[in-house]
Amino acid sequence: LDAPIAVTQFADLLNPEYYGVYALQSGLGLPEREYYIKNDDKSAEIRHKYRDHVAKILELARIPDAAQRAGDIVELEARLAARHMRKEDLRDWSQNYNKVATADLNEIMPNFDWAVFLDELGADELGALILVTTDYFRALDGIIVDTDLDTWKAYLKWSALNATATRLSADIDAANFEFYGRVLAGTEAQRPLWRRGVNVVNRTLGEVVGRVYVARHFPPEAKDRMEDLVANLISAYEVSIRDLDWMSEDTRSQALDKLAKFTAKIGYPDQWRDYSLLEISGDDLYGNLERAAAAEHERELARLGGKVDRAEWGIPPQTVNAYYSPPLNEIVFRAAILQPPFFNLVADDAVNYGALGAVIGHEIGHGFDDSGSRFDGDGVLRNWWTDSDREEFEKRTARLVEQYDAFRPFDDLAVNGEFTLGENIGDLGGITIGLLAYTLALDGREAPVIDGFTGIQRVFLGYAQVWRNKYREEALRLLIGTNPHAPSMYRANGAVRNVPEFYAAFDVVEDDALYLPPAERVKIW
């Protein structure tokens, strides 16, 4: 339960060989702070329906005075939300890393007993806590005192019910879907029970499922091909960094050092998780999940103060995704992403470089985006840029923010260019470097024309195919408000309109919808 404080553990950003424990803002039942503070009609309607939903869950849980308590809970959450840091500001670790000795935590929150809190977590011997949202904690201290005890009790009961609603009674599960599925996301029908069951097993015993998935669906030749692609993309990034005309030699040297220290995990872990001590009962869903959570908590406690396990994978191999870790300076590509539309063993190189090549380039690019660029090649949070180079980088990224701010799927809602900046830098770098890697792989040979499309055209087509998607209005609004990725159509079109080769490949001219004047096109990496 992470209300109203979330505690998590990952590499210490100033000493990434060892784990650090982080505390940050939390405790909202709606997806994000703006749901509580915006005054437009849609936000007000959602808040009204949310209050009714809280009352419904409390009533189903047989908690007295459900309607009154629901109002108190939503009011308390609104006070917490008003003190939450903006999601855009959470990206800057140089401002949000605040390591405080546990003995000094009460100077920030004198009305909160940190010693008892940490003891309940099993972390009573922890020497320091890294506060990510310090101003929130200062404000929370006052909210704790100003809010009556009965409201806190009701809020914590609600938070526990909300966190476990999908595994409680059928009526609570149905009510949970009605709000979070139908109202917030526009989903018309809940998934069948068997699919929800698969998801539960997947989340709880991910590497058990992953081991079976890899054996059935991940041939060795796919991993070999992926390793080649990663090596080629890193080589292309090196060429690009060496050729940048806006970067000084001092910063360039540091960037190349960081690139050379990248590590890649491909497919699946070398050592699978051992779940043999986890007790599982065929007729005790809640108990199974509770025991699994307790086992995971004990696993985290055993790591306190220890060295980071670099062999660990954050998400199992059957998940279609990839990620970059700044403090580990590693890129991770799971087995499940090595399938169409991202990758096809029988497709030609152009399509694969445009699709998976751009994904690889995207993840490498996160090491050099607005957030990842603040970490060096050893994963240490430090400034390795000259002031003039950082200023030039931020001028270029500001123009990218302006471009994405202009994308407006609805009259009353635009993409948040500041919030999505890191992903947009990744997308632009991904297709740019994917294209360069394909050109380098040709090694001067002329690419064949296939089905009337040149090699360069097929790179762009492979990239665009990755982003085919359809959204319900509610889901699109939810994504724009909470997700650091732009909607798919803008990920495809927003990146390519900055790439000169796109104009030549498809004869894009001034009257075309995706045309950008050369002076407005952004090149970063």
Residue spans of the language-model regions?
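Noncatalytic, helix-rich "gating/capping" subdomain that lines the substrate-entry/channel surface
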Residues: 1-228, 232
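Intrinsically disordered, low-complexity linker/terminal regions across diverse proteins
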Residues: 79, 108-112, 126, 130-137, ...
